[in-house]
Structures are given as structure tokens and as C-alpha cells.
């Protein structure tokens, strides 16, 4: 090796060491300043709080507070579901599996939530069935789970955020009831006869309530408000699926008991990114749960949430620090438990996988602009926070990406559990500290 080469090698080594020491110095200063924000906070001192701030460029945790303690993540769980989708269905969602036998077309569900979804309006699979020219037969039995996820609150069965899970969902698995000229407009039409007046109910608050075990919907004997709009989960069943399909396709759909063969073809439908965005921006629990069944379709003849999660953890999350407890797709279950360090590690994996900030941030709520972060930060056309919120009773979290005035991108997880303060106070304190990071670094 010549003297010149030795000199260059030594210079490069010295330069690398200098950069490393410089980054460490900056990170230590940041850690001290962020820690001061927590120390002076009169809000976070009142409950169980966890925080992690991570630099993806240097792959270093800058600051942590209870970063290895487990928290109930609520809808931050959807970040796990999102990452799994980026890996398992990177382009389009499988809508149906099918085989053709003579004059018959036999099909199986994949869990695809976009079929006749009110927002996504995916009709590709329905057009395929309608135009097939063959006799149609639906083969149920792929889904081997319950209609609710592990650990869900069953008394929320009438609320829009807790639709049932099944293998061939249609129309969000939801009854839509709206006011129209003083009367009720009901969709899907196949369930109109299931909605009736309860003459004995004279409560002032107008609300449609379903019987827990069956599709019997009652509304009170009061005037329908002019702006009334309600979504009520309907009770899923194979018979209802067939009726909804037949009514939509305007042709009969038969029922057949048949195990899906290995050579069953796949009909792909809507682009995955549009489904991820529809899940992440409004925090759609229905889409999140159904996506786990879609992922299960990619690895098994059975549609099973537990098997899908186990596969994803082994194949894509094996390097995640800690031992995350992940039990559903949406975060409705309190059985989910993640640490702030695990959350920023996951965010880093998402960041690396997408490798395109414009594409990634378009699929996430933006602080002050869109989704569940729209009202968490001041209104703006130039958001600096992109991420996911998560809320249950006494739980409010936020994990995502913060862009700083100096042009840096940092990953953060802010987890707040077991508080009795108003959620608005917790939300405002998170915004204050994250905004401080944006402005100072």
C-alpha cells in the first residue's frame, strides 16, 4: 500500500469517526432537551407514559422514556397490519378464489373488505361474477374464527366501529340508515324488511338498535331528525351473503359445500395502497380486521387471524425488539401490548419498505390536514407530522414521523395509558412536545 493510499484511508476513517461523534453529540443534546419537556410537563406526570424518538438516518434511538415498557396501543396496532400488507399484498388485493367446472363457477371469499365498500367501491369481483355466463356457487367455510376478535367488547355490537368479521364481506358488513324527506332510507335493500318501528320506545334520542343475535332492527317512536345518519353492523351469515350477492348481481347464487382446491385461481381487485389509505386515515377497524384474513389467504387454505399474525411475526418481525403481544388487526382488543421501542422499530421497517416519503405520507393521517390527526395539530397545508393515533377508554397514543425545520425525519412513539384526564388534554400535550421537536431540531 502506497503512502498516499494509507493517508487517504486514514483520512476517511478519521472523517467517519468525526461524523459518528458529531451525531452522538447532537443526539445527546436532543435527548437532554426533549427530556426537559417531559420533566416540566404537568400533564404526563399524572399517568403512565412512554416515549421513543428514533433517527432512521443514523439508526439510533435518540431518547426514550419507559421505552421498553408495554402499553395498550389501541389503533396504533393498525401500523402492524399496514406493514404486513406492504409485505404480503404489495400490489393488489385478492378478491376471490374460484374454479370452473363445466357450466358452473364455484368461488370462495378471501376476506377482501373492498367488495361494495362505501368508500372504496370495488366492483371488479362482482362484475366478474355477473359477466361469467356460468351458474354461480358460493362455497363457504374458509374462515375459522369468531365474528369478533380476541378480547373485543361485545356490548359495542351496535356501534359502527365494530363490524363483524367474515370471509366474504359486502357493503362494509353494515346497515346504513339515513334520513330522506322525513323517512328512513335503508341500505342494503335486502335488509329493509328487518327494520321496524318500536311503538313502545319514546326516547328523545333517535337511534336504531339491532338485536344482538339476529338482524332485527328497531327505531323509536319519534320524528326522524333531518340530518340523521347511522351505520349499524349487521349480523353476518352465509344465507345473508348469498342474498346480498343475488340481489346485487340480479342473478341466482347457489350454495355448495366444497373445500377449496390447491389449483383454485385468484381474481385480483383493487390496488393495495388505496385500501391501506382507507384503513389508516379514518382508522377503519373493519378494513384492518379483514386485511388479516386477506393475508391469511396468501399462506393457507384457511382464513385464520391467529395463523396470519404468527406467520407475519416469524417472517417479517423477527428482529423487532421485545416480545410484542399482537392479537387483532384493528387494536380494539386490550390484549395487544407494544413498547415505544417496538413501535419506532416498526415505523423504521415501514419507512425502509416504502422508501418513498410522498407515497408513505399519502397513506397516513397528516397533522392539521387529514385523517385522525387533522384536529390534533393547527390547520395547515404543510403538515410536519404523519402517523397513526390510537384511542380506547383511558388510552390515547400517537406514533409516526415528524419532519423538522432543519430537514430531518425522525420517528416517534408517544404512548399514554391509564389516565383520567380529558383526552383533549393528553392530545394537546403530545402535540406540544412533537411540535417542539419539529421546531428545534
Predicted regions and their residues:
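Bacterial Sec-dependent N-terminal signal peptides
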Residues: 1-37
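Beta-lactamase-like hydrolase cores
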Residues: 24-70, 89-92, 129-134
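Short beta-strand scaffold segments in enzyme catalytic cores
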Residues: 51-53, 97-99, 399-400
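Solvent-exposed loop/turn segments at secondary-structure junctions
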Residues: 57-59, 69-72, 111-115, 142-145, ...
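Small-residue-rich helix-loop
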Residues: 62-64, 292-441
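Active/ligand-binding-proximal structured segments within catalytic/core domains
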Residues: 71-85
